């Protein structure tokens, strides 16, 4: 992994929205937003779709665009779509060109999501989250905190303690077995990334959890613009889990945080 100093950025940098954001005095306390349930007791369940094999990234973008439009128009239900992609890099709206270290290594896609550079590839579970926040809460920071909570509860099913950081969106794992950083602080690795976009309060893009990707593929970028910390995966942490195991845990944790889902 590249080394260097952590480039400071504001919290929730992995957000891109063209929906109005109302400031809240509570947004400094993400734990208060552990649940992001529908406001209506009889709200329909969220559709839960798993696609086997590797999904072309451009096809995934086109699918999300169409689905978000349909959700806005009321002709389709909310959806969480679980996929894997072939190896590729994506650039968010805050991406710094200098953080793309080997531009010819894998295809690079510019996306409308918030955030910087990240990697997608086999062994990583990507969950595209298409929810209508008007049905829940028009609070972007609360939504991101709930996505973090979803990941944290998923990892807890495997006895992994995932942690959030106020200045770094995503979920982190403390690595006490690794050498401490130059400032004496404990080493931390990122195990899950978050990058979203909102269109009139309907979300798309989502989260990515490292199950068993080739971690060397991250060497072509500075992940999320953070060079001081590395990346890890469930298998890298010594857990012989499968993608199916993770999908089960994701489903249970989703219902805890966001409410009922329906598989097809």
Curated annotation (Swiss-Prot):
Keywords: Acyltransferase, Cytoplasm, Transferase. Substrate binds at residues 113-120, 193-195, 206-208. InterPro entries: aa-tRNA-synth_II/BPL/LPL, BPL_LPL_catalytic, Octanoyltransferase, Octanoyltransferase_CS. The active site is at 224 (acyl-thioester intermediate). Coiled coil: none annotated. Its EC number is 2.3.1.181. Pfam families: LplA-B_cat. GO terms for molecular function: lipoyl(octanoyl) transferase activity. Pathway: Protein modification; protein lipoylation via endogenous pathway; protein N(6)-(lipoyl)lysine from octanoyl-[acyl-carrier-protein]: step 1/2. The record marks 190 as: Lowers pKa of active site Cys. In the reaction, the free carboxyl group of octanoic acid is attached via an amide linkage to the epsilon-amino group of a specific lysine residue of lipoyl domains of lipoate-dependent enzymes. Belongs to the LipB family. HAMAP family: LipB. This is Octanoyltransferase.
């Amino acid at each position: 992994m590249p080394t260097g100093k952590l480039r400071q950025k504001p919290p929730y940098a992995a957000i891109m929205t063209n929906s109005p954001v109302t400031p809240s005095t509570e947004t400094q306390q993400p734990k208060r937003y552990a649940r992001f349930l529908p406001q209506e007791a009889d709200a329909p369940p969220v559709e839960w779709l798993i696609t086997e094999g590797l999904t072309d990234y451009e096809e995934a973008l086109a699918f999300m665009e169409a689905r978000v439009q349909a959700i806005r128009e009321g002709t389709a239900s909310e959806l969480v779509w679980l996929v894997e992609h072939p190896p590729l890099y994506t650039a968010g709206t805050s991406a710094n060109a200098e953080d793309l270290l080997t531009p010819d290594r894998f295809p690079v896609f510019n996306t409308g999501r918030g955030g910087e550079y990240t990697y997608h590839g086999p062994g990583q579970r990507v969950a595209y989250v298409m929810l209508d926040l008007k049905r829940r809460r028009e609070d972007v920071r609360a939504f991101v905190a709930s996505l973090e909570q979803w990941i944290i509860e998923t990892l807890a099913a495997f006895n992994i303690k995932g942690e959030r950081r106020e200045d770094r969106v995503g979920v982190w794992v403390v690595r006490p077995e690794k050498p401490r950083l130059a400032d004496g602080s404990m080493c931390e690795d990122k195990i899950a990334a978050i990058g979203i976009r909102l269109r009139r309060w309907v979300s798309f893009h989502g989260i990515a959890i490292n199950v068993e990707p080739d971690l060397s593929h991250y060497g072509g970028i500075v992940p999320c613009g953070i060079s001081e910390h590395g990346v890890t995966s469930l298998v890298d942490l010594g857990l012989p889990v499968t993608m199916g195991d993770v999908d089960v845990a994701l489903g249970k944790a989703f219902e805890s945080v966001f409410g009922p889902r329906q598989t097809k």
